[in-house]
Design a protein with these regions (language model features):
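Structural/interface elements that position substrates and couple domains in central-metabolism enzymes
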Residues: 1-181
Length: 181
């Protein structure tokens, strides 16, 4: 979201104004910004060329229960996907209007039903941990997607549960999990 980076930068500026050079604060800011690239890197590393791929994205707001997309990691992900030639179809309970306004209505497709977003998708990226995303019908997900492949930026799911549903699962800070045979 917009508060954390703003607050880190404000503390940094205040410290510098008082003659102290806080070396850790610029590092915190840089790490926070770099973390926004992790999900795209995982998708790109797994799928390779993204031209013509359809990536479903669940969650646009920087956190659940808001439509605020300022400094949202979804912005970085979607812009990177579009630049790489992918098509993006999204769902967010609150922030679809804000994202469409920012990126342009033609840049992404916003869909009211989170399961409909998955139709024919080459992968799903989960960016915001909305409650509605916590207990999906994995069987339906697998049937809807062109490739049953989830990139979970919020570690919402138990990897074994996803693997048992025959879906490949990539999360943050965990090894990828291939579908159970």
């Amino acid at each position: 979201g917009s508060c954390f980076p703003k607050d880190v930068r404000a503390v940094d500026q205040t410290a510098r104004a008082h003659g102290y050079e806080p070396r850790i604060l610029p590092a915190v800011d840089a790490i926070n910004e770099a973390q926004k690239e992790v999900l795209f890197s995982k998708i790109k590393n797994r799928l390779g060329d993204l031209s013509g791929k359809l990536i479903a994205v669940w969650g646009l707001a920087f956190k659940p229960n808001t439509d605020d997309i300022r400094e949202a990691s979804s912005l970085v992900l979607i812009r990177s996907l579009l630049e790489a030639g992918a098509s993006v179809r999204t769902h967010d309970p609150e922030a679809m209007g804000a994202m469409s306004s920012l990126l342009g209505a033609d840049a992404i497709t916003c869909v009211d039903d989170p399961m409909e977003v998955l139709d024919g998708a080459d992968a799903l990226a989960i960016v915001t941990e909305w409650k509605t995303f916590r207990s999906p019908d994995f069987s339906r997900m697998k049937k809807s997607m062109k490739a049953p492949l989830i990139f979970d930026g919020r570690n919402l799911y138990d990897p074994e549960t996803v693997a048992n549903a025959s879906i490949e699962y990539h999360a943050i800070g965990r090894p990828p999990v291939k579908p159970a045979v």
